[in-house]
Amino acid sequence: MNIIDELEWRGAIYQQTDEEGLRKWVEEKQISLYCGIDPSGDSMHIGHLIPFMILRRFQNAGHRPIILVGGATGTIGDPSGKKEERKLQSMEQISKNVESLRVQLGKIFDFEGNSAASMVNNYDWTKDVSILDFLRDYGKEFNVNTMLSKDIVASRLEVGISFTEFAYQILQAMDFNHLYEFNDCRLQIGGSDQWGNITAGLDLIRKKQGENAKAFGLTIPLLTKADGTKFGKSEGGAIWLNPEKTTPYEFYQFWINTDDRDVVKYLKYFTFLTEAEIDELAKQVETEPHLRAAQKTLAAEMTKFVHSEEALEQALKISKALFSGDVKALTADEIEQGFKDVPTFVAEDTEANLVDWLVTLGIEPSKRQAREDVGNGAIYINGERQQDLEKIMDASDRIENKFTIVRRGKKKYFLVSYK
């Protein structure tokens, strides 16, 4: 299947500059193509992942992806989709962010073989361009009226836009022209808000490389959820690729909780499952939605892809333990992942009567309530029901000598660590 046909059935194409030309080009040649990301933060979130998934599909089809990390453009900030001016970051912070993104993106692509990916930083070819060179060699090629008409600028004219952000599209166009000239890059991929920046690059290539220069642009639709909320966010905020910001367990849970109305769309966008495999899962959503086979597949595929097989196994283990209540088999690391958002208490490293211990920590409001809950079998320590009012809490009640998991009733969890 032609990669363009595959992207179309996946619903992953919003706009392209020359469909017939690009389709023919990718059928007949191995092409280089790129997608960029600015280091505005130290981690990608799953919304950033969308265009890079397209880039990876091109690699799977035998083409060469170029991943551009914007060490230069990141110092300015892309005005696309922003209602107000970005705050500029220090060069030191941007450099740190660049390295963090390099690590994350390095896990997504193959860097060996005939279709090996490459990673570039636009700071390398931008840092020595003087202001006079910029104005003479590049600024001269851009018509201000055309720049003002592009959505990325027009949407900001009422509230105002600095020359810095106004000039962003010139810098991004310089990137495409540079990669065309030195890396034989023929295609730029981006989100739907990048159309103006991409077409600016194509115009510059034609002016610098000649009217017969073959280059293309392709954008991806804005991904929306069936309930109208923004994709990529949970109640706790953005879903990050950095495991220190969003644990693999939380990452897995985000996908497993996907709405039935969205899951088939996400399978097409984010996984490498075939059309037949996705069609089969779509049927199960219709006939056996309670089994959540599509969500389980989506969560497993994404956790493996972004993290690892080991991280998936860990997420499944935590999920199973929380569902069954058998938490004793969890490691300290797994407990930190699975109980990240539950009320947490710090206890003295001493022995104590269970009832007193629950009240001292604040898990129970009073001794009377604590005795009642223990006596009724409503208190569980590390998954085991406790009904002995005289029980002494000691080191044997700690997992890896670090944590005690308390459950009150069926679902109310508390995590206790020790001084």
UniProtKB/Swiss-Prot annotation:
Short sequence motif 'KMSKS' region: positions: 230-234
Main subcellular localisation: cytoplasm
Enzyme nomenclature, EC number: 6.1.1.1
Residues spanned by motif 'HIGH' region: 39-48
Disulfide bonds: none
Record family assignment: Belongs to the class-I aminoacyl-tRNA synthetase family. TyrS type 1 subfamily.
Protein name: Tyrosine--tRNA ligase
Organism (species): Listeria monocytogenes serotype 4b (strain CLIP80459)
